Every structure is written in C-alpha cells, then in structure tokens.
Amino acid sequence: MKQTIVGVLFLLVLTLSVSSAVAQDEAKRASTKQQLAQLLEKTGPGINVAFRVSQKQTYNFIGTLSKGLANAQSFEIVISVTAKDTIGFRIYPHYAGGYINVDKVKNGPGLMRLLLRLSDRGFLFWGVDETGDVFNGYTFTLESGFPEDAIRVVLRSIVNSDKFIGEMRPFIDGSSAAK
C-alpha cells in the first residue's frame, strides 16, 4: 500500500512538472511571436511587405513581396515561430502564375542541381517542400535571445533572390536565363 501511495505521488509530481515546463515553453513561444510581430510591423514597410498572422497557423506570419522584381512575379514569405525555439523563413517564389514545382517544370533534375549550387552560393538556402514547391529559406535558433538585427538582414536580403529565379528559367519553362 505504501509503495502504491509513493508511486501515485511520484506520478503526480512528474505530471505537474511536465505541465509546468510545457506552459513555460508556450509562454516563451508567445513572447517570441510578439517580438517578431513588432519587428515585422516596423520593418515590413521598408521592404514593401505587409505582414499578417496566418489564419491557418497562428504562429506563422505571411506577406508578399512584389515590388522591385525582374524575374519572379512575387515572393510569398512565411515566417514561423516554432515550438523548438527557432524562427524559420520559407520564401516561395511565384513565377508564371504560381509556385515553382519541381514535378511540373520542364527539367526537374536540372532545377534540383541548380538549387543545390545556389544554396552554396547564396546567403539564403534553397529547398523543396513536401509538395515539390521550391522555396528560399533561413532558420534562426533562439539560444542567445531574439536576433532582431539578423532578422532585419534576412528580410532585406529576400529581394536579392530574384536574380536566382532568372537563372532557373531554362529549367522551369525553357526560356533563356536572365542576364
């Protein structure tokens, strides 16, 4: 009987400590979201992007960059505050009316090789999501606090990815690469 009581008390203490840790993690994530919202509100107008909270995922901010581009029609910017103490950028270029999808382009293997080379050359990395859509990305860890200045640098760098869309054109639709 005494062992049962000790076991129940142990499980109760363990449950309370786990739920307390989860609450602290959620509070930290909410605080990071608020800091990011304030930064995006200040920085967005300077890069011609109005950010808003996603209706589907409340820890995501979304915005569209469409000014100052020569190759992409726009860049759809998704910024996520994750439960794992990171902030992730996924920037989806729109070209010819939609996403660039490796399964639907003229030369998928060639585009994939180019994406790998561009990841080596550029500041932001290139990737493909689970549906095959091409994106540009960056991930911050929050171990040392909120990286306000670094986030500003990434936001200002997004427009520079437009030149890479020009390099992708032969693989996307067979047109000439932008000069």
Question: What would you call each of these model-derived segments?
Answer:
Residues G7-S17:
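Bacterial N-terminal signal peptides
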Residues N71-I100:
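A short acidic-to-branched-hydrophobic micro-motif
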Residues Q24-A27, A96-K104, F140-V154:
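Second-shell loop/turn segments in exported
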Residues R169-K179:
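Short, highly charged C-terminal tails/helix-capping segments
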Residues Q57-N60, T86-I87, G132-V134:
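Hydrophobic residues embedded in beta-strands of well-ordered beta-sheets
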Residues Q3, A21-S74:
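Charge-rich, low-complexity N-terminal segments
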Residues A27, K42, R90-V134:
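Short, internal acidic amphipathic alpha-helical interface segments
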Residues L116-G166:
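A short, solvent-exposed beta-edge/loop patch
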